[in-house]
C-alpha cells in the first residue's frame, strides 16, 4: 500500500521559530491544511468513472468510526471527518484548544481542482468513496456552510472561556486552589461546587447534545457531533449513517 501525506512539504531547516517558511531570504507564512487527510494511489476506480482515465491519487479525508465497537453495525454504517485544531488564531493556543473553521476543502493549502467546491467521487478505498480534492461530502451534503461555521465558532468560544488562564473566574479558582494548598480543587470542586472551567465544559457538552444534535440536526436522523472531549480536544467529530455502499457519509471529529 502506497500512501503519502498532503501536498505541502517544507524542509525543517527552512522553518523559523515563529512557524514561518524562510526561503532565499523571503519569509512567508506557512499555509494551513487539514493534516488528518492523506493521499493514496492504491484504490479502485469508482463505478461512475469507469470510462475516465484513472487519477494518479485520491484524497482520503473521512475515516472509520473508531468511537464504536468495530464489530457493530454503526462502525460500518458511519464515517468520520476530522476537523483539526488550529494554532494561529489566538494567543496561548497550546493550552486553549481551538478548531479550524475552514469549511473542509477550503483551507489555504487544500487540494483543489477546477470544479470548485463540489465533492466528486473518483475512487474507492477501504470500501468507501473518495475524490481527487480535499472537499468532503460533509458540506454542503449534510449541513450548510453557515451551520458549520456557527457550530465550530461556538465550540471555540466555549473552549476559550473554559481554558483561558486570564479569565477572571479561572484566576479566582486558581488563587483559591493555591491558598488552600490544593484543598479547593481536590475537595470543594469534587464534592461541593464545580470550577468555572468545568462548568463551561459542561455547558459545551449540553450545547452539542441539546442545541445541535437534538435541535439543529433533529430533522436529520443519524447526523450528530461527538464531544471533542472524546478525542482529547484534538479534533471535532460528526456522524452520519452510510445509507449506500461506497457512498461517503460523515462524522465531524
Curated annotation (Swiss-Prot):
Region (Disordered): 1-22
Alphabetic keyword roster: Endoplasmic reticulum, Membrane
Pfam families reported in the protein's UniProt record: Erf4
Basic and acidic residues bias (residue ranges): 1-14
Any single Gene Ontology cellular-component annotation: endoplasmic reticulum palmitoyltransferase complex
InterPro entries hit by this protein: Golgin_A_7/ERF4, Ras_palmitoyltransferase
Subcellular location: Endoplasmic reticulum membrane
Keyword hit for Membrane: yes
Principal subcellular localization: endoplasmic reticulum
Membrane topology: Peripheral membrane protein
GO biological process, one term: protein targeting to membrane
Family that this chain belongs to: Belongs to the ERF4 family.
Function: The ERF2-ERF4 complex is a palmitoyltransferase specific for Ras proteins. Palmitoylates RAS2, which is required for its proper plasma membrane localization.
SUBUNIT field: Interacts with ERF2.
Name listed for the protein in its UniProt record: Ras modification protein ERF4
Origin species: Debaryomyces hansenii (strain ATCC 36239 / CBS 767 / BCRC 21394 / JCM 1990 / NBRC 0083 / IGC 2968)
Lineage: Eukaryota, Fungi, Dikarya, Ascomycota, Saccharomycotina
Amino acid at each position: 500500500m502506497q500512501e503519502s501525506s498532503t501536498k505541502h512539504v517544507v524542509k525543517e531547516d527552512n522553518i523559523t521559530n515563529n512557524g514561518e517558511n524562510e526561503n532565499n531570504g523571503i519569509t512567508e507564512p506557512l499555509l494551513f491544511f487539514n493534516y488528518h487527510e492523506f493521499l493514496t494511489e492504491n484504490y479502485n476506480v469508482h463505478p461512475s468513472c469507469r470510462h475516465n482515465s484513472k487519477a494518479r491519487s485520491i484524497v482520503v479525508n473521512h475515516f472509520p468510526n473508531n468511537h464504536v465497537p468495530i464489530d457493530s453495525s454503526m462502525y460500518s454504517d458511519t464515517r468520520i471527518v476530522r476537523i483539526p485544531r488550529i494554532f494561529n488564531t489566538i494567543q496561548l493556543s497550546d493550552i486553549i484548544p481551538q478548531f479550524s473553521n475552514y469549511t473542509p476543502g477550503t483551507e489555504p493549502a487544500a487540494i483543489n481542482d477546477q470544479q470548485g467546491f463540489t465533492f466528486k467521487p473518483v475512487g474507492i478505498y477501504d470500501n468507501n468513496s473518495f475524490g481527487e480534492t480535499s472537499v468532503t461530502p460533509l458540506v454542503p451534503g449534510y449541513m450548510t456552510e453557515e451551520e458549520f461555521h456557527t457550530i465550530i465558532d461556538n465550540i471555540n468560544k466555549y473552549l476559550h472561556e473554559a481554558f483561558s488562564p486570564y479569565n477572571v473566574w479561572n484566576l479566582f479558582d486558581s488563587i483559591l486552589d493555591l491558598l488552600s494548598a490544593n484543598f479547593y480543587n481536590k475537595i470543594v470542586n469534587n464534592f461541593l461546587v464545580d470550577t468555572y472551567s468545568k462548568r463551561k465544559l459542561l455547558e459545551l457538552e449540553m450545547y452539542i447534545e441539546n442545541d445541535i444534535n437534538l435541535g439543529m440536526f433533529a430533522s436529520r436522523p443519524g447526523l450528530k457531533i461527538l464531544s471533542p472531549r472524546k478525542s482529547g480536544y484534538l479534533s471535532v467529530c460528526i456522524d452520519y449513517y452510510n445509507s449506500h455502499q461506497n457512498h461517503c457519509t460523515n462524522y465531524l471529529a
